[in-house]
Swiss-Prot record:
GO cellular component: host cell nucleus
Similarity comment text for this entry: Belongs to the adenoviridae packaging protein 3 family.
Upper classification of the organism: Viruses, Varidnaviria, Bamfordvirae, Preplasmiviricota, Tectiliviricetes
Protein's name in the database: Packaging protein 3
Other noteworthy facts: All late proteins expressed from the major late promoter are produced by alternative splicing and alternative polyadenylation of the same gene giving rise to non-overlapping ORFs. A leader sequence is present in the N-terminus of all these mRNAs and is recognized by the viral shutoff protein to provide expression although conventional translation via ribosome scanning from the cap has been shut off in the host cell.
The organism of origin for this protein: Human adenovirus A serotype 12 (HAdV-12)
Name of the gene encoding the protein in the UniProt record: L1
GO terms of biological process kind: viral DNA genome packaging; viral release from host cell
Conditions for induction: Expressed in the early phase and late phase of the viral replicative cycle.
Residue numbers carrying Phosphoserine: 52, 334
Subunit structure: Part of the genome packaging complex composed of packaging proteins 1, 2 and 3; this complex specifically binds to the packaging sequence on the left end of viral genomic DNA and performs packaging of the viral genome. Interacts with hexon-linking protein IIIa; this interaction is required to promote correct genome packaging.
UniProt xrefs under HAMAP family: ADV_PKG3 (MF_04058)
Length: 373
């Protein structure tokens, strides 16, 4: 504790001489007072009882809650627009080359921080810079690998659904018709209806609205490629379709990246970003196809639990048996159509919730008894 703060503390109450004589005359001995330590008294330079880091409560708390943390880095996507052109590509390739002969077990010592006579850079500084490049390279590879795995899982889940193939077929059919006849009012109405399903992505929505124009050509190519893989190639396995879609995304990304830079050499970070853009748009097309594929023109049947259907009477059972023996009915008759002529009666709980009078239910039961007779 600081000496000035120690003098400002109130002193403990001292025993007077008369009180000491009275205590000695009575034969009572004064018990020695143990110094009590108030740990909650003061902080900083006014703290008591913390003469070493091992006894300091805040130091111990910080040590117990300390967690090793390495900040996340991605050379391709962090600090967009703040670095020199092609610098990300150089750092990525440098980290990949340094990773091969990098000594991860090296322990820096005092003499390692002395600058070199020729280069003026200490070996410790060079080692730390190399470690930063290697760490950034490894974290970038890990994040890009996770992004690719996530894309593969999403694509595999979507193309496994039959609704996606049906919706993509109708979407491609509409796009081909609209490109050849953009002035058609019915097709324009369909276009605005389709755009309603893609309001969360402005880039995709604008490209869909301008798909008949040159600025929407890339989306038309993407839909054609996905349709040729998912709809046309029905014999391909699920893994082959995922691989074909990935190859198509890489081909499209490389083509447009070279078109942007007007050179066969494109920085790897820009090529990865363009590939990621096409991957996100491919997922958007497949998701839109899933939304459109659920709107079928098939007859929708509501499956009713067997416990909520009235059991067959003897007369109805014999009638159904006669129809089955004679082969009555059409060949397209489905399982649910077999019981279409039966009468379904809701449960008593459902009737009570709907507020139907008990007299109505009794009347229905009488009608059923007459039907059975």
């Amino acid at each position: 504790m600081h000496p000035v703060l120690r003098q400002m503390r109130p002193q403990p109450r001292a025993t007077t001489a008369s009180a000491a004589v009275a205590l000695s005359g009575s034969g009572e001995q004064e018990e020695p007072q143990c110094p009590t330590l108030e740990l909650e008294e003061g902080e900083g330079i006014a703290r008591l009882g913390a003469h070493s880091p091992e006894r300091h409560p805040r130091v111990q708390l910080a040590r117990d809650s300390r967690v090793a943390f390495v900040p996340r880095q991605n050379m391709f996507r962090d600090n967009s627009g703040e670095e020199a052109e092609e610098m990300r590509d150089c750092r990525f390739r440098a980290g990949r080359e340094l990773r091969r002969g990098f000594n991860r077990e090296r322990l820096l010592r005092e003499e390692d921080f002395e600058p070199d006579e020729h280069s003026g850079i200490s070996s410790a500084r060079a080692h730390v810079s190399a470690a930063n490049l290697v760490t950034a390279y490894e974290q970038t590879v890990t994040e890009e690998r996770n992004f690719q795995k996530s894309f593969n899982n999403h694509v595999r889940t979507l193309i496994a659904r039959e609704e996606v193939a049906i919706g993509l077929m109708h979407l491609w059919d509409f796009v081909e018709a609209y490109v050849h006849n953009p002035a058609s009012k019915p097709l324009t109405a369909q276009l605005f209806l389709i755009v309603q399903h893609s309001r969360d992505n402005e880039t995709f929505r604008d490209a869909m609205l301008n798909i008949a124009e040159p600025q929407g050509r890339w989306l038309l190519d993407l839909i054609n490629i996905l349709q040729s893989i998912v709809v046309q190639e029905r014999s391909l396995s699920l893994a082959d379709k995922v691989a074909a879609i990935n190859y198509s995304m890489l081909s499209l990304g490389k083509f447009y990246a070279r078109k942007i830079y007007k050179s066969p050499y494109v920085p790897i970070d820009k090529e990865v970003k363009i590939d990621s853009f096409y991957m996100r748009m491919a997922l958007k097309v497949l998701t839109l196809s899933d939304d459109l594929g659920v709107y079928r023109n098939d007859r929708i049947h509501k499956a009713v639990s067997a416990s909520r259907r009235r059991e067959l009477s003897d007369k109805e059972l014999m009638h159904s048996l006669q129809r089955a023996l004679t082969g009555a009915g059409t060949e397209d008759e489905s399982f649910f159509d077999m019981g279409a002529d039966l009468r379904w009666q809701p449960s008593a709980r459902a009737l009570e919730a709907a507020g139907v009078a008990s007299a109505d239910v009794t009347g229905d039961d009488d009608d059923e008894d007459q039907y059975e007779d």
